[in-house]
Amino acid sequence: MIIKKLILSISLVMLFLPAKAEWTHVGTSGSSVLVFYVDYKNITVEGNYVKSKRLVDYHKEQKTEKGEFYWSAISIYTFDCMKKLQQVERFRYTDRMGGGTRLENDFFKSEWENVAAGTPNDNYFIRACAFRS
């Protein structure tokens, strides 16, 4: 009986843990300073809204305005597929590929804004919104 309860408890905990990202390489800047990845496995869809994560890995260590060093950033994009709008939340990390420690005092969240046509974000928007069907 105790083993059944333990297995049930572990199963419930695993159910509510966030899924581990599976990063797919989607591009590199012309100067190879930035490398872009998207987590296509964990895209969520709610009506007209699609939420997806994008990771940027930097070729060289970067420095925030507050003097903290980081190697990567993960952005959570929420797209309004009907209105062609996006909202972005960004977190920076001390190691490559979103590893190390997340910088505690470095959170950014944008207002809703238009997705500009012909930009890399426009391509990202199109691919992410395709998950609605």
Region locations from a protein language model:
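Sec-dependent signal peptide recognition
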Residues: I3-S9
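Hydrophobic h-region of N-terminal signal peptides that target proteins for export
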Residues: S11-A19
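Intrinsically disordered, low-complexity segments enriched in polar/charged small residues
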Residues: S9-I10, H59
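N-terminal secretory-pathway/extracellular module detecting exported/lumenal segments
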Residues: A19-I74, T78-S133
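Short, low-complexity interaction segments enriched in Ser/Thr/Pro/Gly
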Residues: M1-I2, L17
